[in-house]
Amino acid sequence: MSTITTSSVASSNGMRKNGKNWHDSKKPFRPTSGLTSYEKRLEARKLQEAVKEHEREMREEREAERKAQIQKIKDRRAAKEEKERYEKMAEKMHRKRVERLKRREKRNKLLHS
């Protein structure tokens, strides 16, 4: 009977690939595996995600401010160009005609936008 039990124990482990069954089977070397509990890891992960979310919000806010500033500059430049264009037109033609063209262009701009 003793031979049956020893063979069943040996067969449960299986044969080693190199055939040295007299050596103990090695276990993986994980020195830090049991140091922190699962709850602590979950808590740290939640904290990290909250920090990342806050950073993402701050980044988006900064980007929105930047885009608003860029749009403001573009609008200012467009207004300046339009003003210069009307001044050039005023040099060439009468003041009343320039005002009439301004009104017409504003109407068209409102219709198309």
Swiss-Prot record:
Residue span of region Disordered = 1-113
- Has the keyword Nucleus been applied to this entry? yes
- Per the annotation, which location comes first and is thus the protein's main one? nucleus
One GO term under biological process is: rRNA processing
Give the signal sequence positions: none
Keywords attached to this Swiss-Prot or TrEMBL record, sorted alphabetically, are: Coiled coil, Nucleus, Ribosome biogenesis, rRNA processing
Give me the Gene Ontology terms describing cellular component. Answer: nucleolus
Biased-composition ranges for Basic and acidic residues?
38-92
| Basic residues composition-biased segments | 93-113
Known role? Involved in nucleolar integrity and required for processing of the pre-rRNA for the 60S ribosome subunit.
Q: What is this protein called?
A: rRNA-processing protein cgrA
What organism is recorded for this protein?
A: Aspergillus clavatus (strain ATCC 1007 / CBS 513.65 / DSM 816 / NCTC 3887 / NRRL 1 / QM 1276 / 107)
